[in-house]
Design a protein with these regions (language model features):
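Short Gly/Thr/Asp-enriched flexible loops that form oxyanion-binding sites at enzyme active sites
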Residues: 107-116
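Short, glycine/charge-rich flexible loops or terminal/linker lids adjacent to PRPP-binding catalytic cores
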Residues: 119-165
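Short, flexible loop segments at the rims of nucleotide/cofactor-binding pockets, characterized by
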Residues: 74-78, 100, 143-146
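A generic local structural motif
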Residues: 84-86, 108-109, 151-157
Length: 166
């Protein structure tokens, strides 16, 4: 896999230039074609055929990379479309609750919960509050910052009521 300079405009033969600030801002129309090789972007295709180009980020000096979606930097139209697709896929499972992982998963979880008709969602956190219970936390690491060891907490007040045994 080949990576360009971070922050440089990207061009793929026959597919034009995507400036760094243009990623996640809109979709290519269905049938527009996608680049054959994934050098600088990955064409994520939605069920309706539209394509969201995701920049490929180098993973250190490994020669490997990941396709990146930063929801807090995408346009409202992209967030809306992704929430619709995810809600449509989740609807048959009839989830009782939607849980969002900080920070980048929170906007999507909120939008998906709304589309599913929920009155709320559960936002997990990485900053412990004095009323949190360590038993309701798990270790957390990230592919983008593997050295940072954090904990992921759920606010005990956000747990659904326990059903009584009969």
């Amino acid at each position: 896999m080949c990576f360009g300079r971070v922050g440089a405009a990207k061009q793929d033969a026959g597919h034009g230039i995507i400036e760094p600030h243009d990623f996640w801002q809109g979709f290519e129309p269905a049938g527009a074609g996608v680049p054959a090789a994934f050098k600088d972007r990955y064409p994520a295709t939605l069920p309706d055929g539209r394509v969201l180009n995701l920049p490929i980020r180098a993973l250190g000096d490994s020669g490997e990379g990941i396709a990146s979606l930063i929801l807090t930097q995408c346009s409202f139209a992209v967030e809306e479309a992704l929430a619709t697709v995810l809600a449509d896929r989740l609807r048959p499972a009839a989830p009782d609750v939607v849980v969002g992982v900080p920070t980048l998963g929170l906007p999507l979880a909120r939008a998906v919960a709304q589309k599913l008709g929920h009155s709320r969602y559960v936002a997990l956190g990485t900053s412990p509050k004095f009323w949190y219970d360590d038993a309701l936390s798990v270790g957390l690491s990230s592919i983008t910052s593997p050295e940072a060891q954090k904990r992921l907490f759920v606010d005990p007040r956000m747990l659904p009521p326990r059903k009584k045994r009969q």
